[in-house]
Every structure is written in structure tokens, then in C-alpha cells.
């Protein structure tokens, strides 16, 4: 399995990105590509045996690495690629906490509750813990997971402020952050 620049696989990246993430959960692709010019951001296509498997977008600093987007082609799911990608990220960033967001699992009335719990269990099986940090992004409630509990709400906000800039961060994404 190889991690290659997403710019080499724009067509496959675009297709997977649009099918794996609802429109209200996607950042503009042009922005993601342009932000990879910064040393702390990485947008990769996952390739195995010359076949496109998935995508991963990460943002990092000296303390931790945030998995902004991770998706595996539907036909490749259930074959261990998600776990392999997460293990690769962890092995390439020794000493750093790896964190990511999933849709909030506290509301049992949402239509995709079982899917949310299944996703939570997948990440827990890969060493992630619930950090008790809730984030509302573009009207969707999320919870932050991490491989260690040393990531705080302020850490997350600072990382995203560095990525998006203060005005964009407030205006579009993080008007509501709650630590439960």
C-alpha cells in the first residue's frame, strides 16, 4: 500500500470524495488541494497494486495529527484498508496523538444511529478513545476521537484556526463548540 499525492489522482479523488461525504460535510476540493502547499497538510491517494483504494487528508502540528478526511472505495471496504491507513498514519507520526471526528453518537433518534455506532466501534478497535469534545460543524454534530486523551478543545480550535484562518473558522464552521 502506498500513499501518493492526491494531485496525481484528481478524477478518482473527486469521485470518491463526492460519494463518501455528504455535501454539507465537504470542504471545497480546490481549497484542500491548495492547502497542501503548507508543510503541515497532506492530501494523499491510497494505492495498492496500482489500484486506487481511497483518500486521506491530514493536518498536523508538533503535538498531534488530525485526520480531516478518510475514505475507502466502497468495493474495497471490509478488507482492512481503513485499519492499514490508520496504522500507517500512526507509525509515520511516532509520539503524536492521532485525532478525528465522527458524527455524534449520543443521539439515538438519528436515522443512521447504527451506522454511527459501527463507525465508533471501528475506531475504538483501532485504538481511538472518545475525548468528550463535541463540535458542531455546518449544522452537523460531531465528537472528537483520539489515540490519546491529551488533545483539548483549545488544541483542536488552534489547529483548525491555523488551517482555515480565524474569520473562516468562525463564520462557517465552529460557531458552536462544547466540551461535555
Where do the model's predicted regions map?
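A short, internal acetyl-CoA/4′-phosphopantetheine-binding micro-motif in the GNAT/acyltransferase core
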Residues: 70-77, 104-106
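Short hydrophobic/aromatic beta-strand element in the GNAT-like acyltransferase core
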Residues: 41-45, 55, 142-144
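Conserved GNAT acetyl-CoA-binding A-motif
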Residues: 93-115
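Active-site rim helix/loop that mediates acceptor-substrate recognition in acyltransferases
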Residues: 19-43, 47
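Short amphipathic alpha-helix that is part of the acyltransferase structural core
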Residues: 1-27, 154-159, 172-180
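Conserved acetyl-CoA-binding loop-helix of GNAT-fold acetyltransferases
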Residues: 72, 78-92, 115
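C-terminal "cap" of GNAT-fold acetyltransferases
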Residues: 115-116, 136-180
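Conserved beta-strand in the GNAT
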Residues: 45, 50-59, 64-71
Amino acid at each position: 500500500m502506498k500513499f501518493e499525492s492526491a494531485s496525481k489522482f484528481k478524477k478518482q479523488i473527486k469521485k470518491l470524495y463526492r460519494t463518501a461525504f455528504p455535501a454539507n460535510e465537504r470542504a471545497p476540493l480546490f481549497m484542500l488541494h491548495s492547502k497542501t502547499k503548507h508543510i503541515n497538510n497532506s492530501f494523499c491517494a491510497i494505492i495498492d497494486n496500482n489500484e486506487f483504494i481511497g483518500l486521506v487528508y491530514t493536518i498536523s502540528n508538533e503535538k498531534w495529527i488530525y485526520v480531516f478526511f478518510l475514505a475507502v472505495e466502497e468495493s474495497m471496504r471490509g478488507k482492512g484498508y481503513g485499519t492499514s491507513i490508520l496504522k500507517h498514519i500512526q507509525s509515520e507520526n511516532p509520539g503524536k496523538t492521532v485525532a478525528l471526528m465522527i458524527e455524534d453518537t449520543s443521539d439515538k433518534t438519528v436515522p443512521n444511529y447504527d451506522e454511527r455506532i459501527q463507525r465508533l466501534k471501528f475506531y475504538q478497535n483501532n485504538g481511538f478513545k472518545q475525548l468528550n469534545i463535541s463540535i458542531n460543524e455546518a449544522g452537523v454534530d460531531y465528537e472528537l476521537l483520539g489515540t490519546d486523551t491529551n488533545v483539548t478543545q483549545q488544541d483542536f480550535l488552534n489547529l483548525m484556526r491555523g488551517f482555515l484562518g480565524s474569520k473562516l473558522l468562525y463564520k462557517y464552521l465552529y460557531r458552536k463548540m462544547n466540551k461535555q
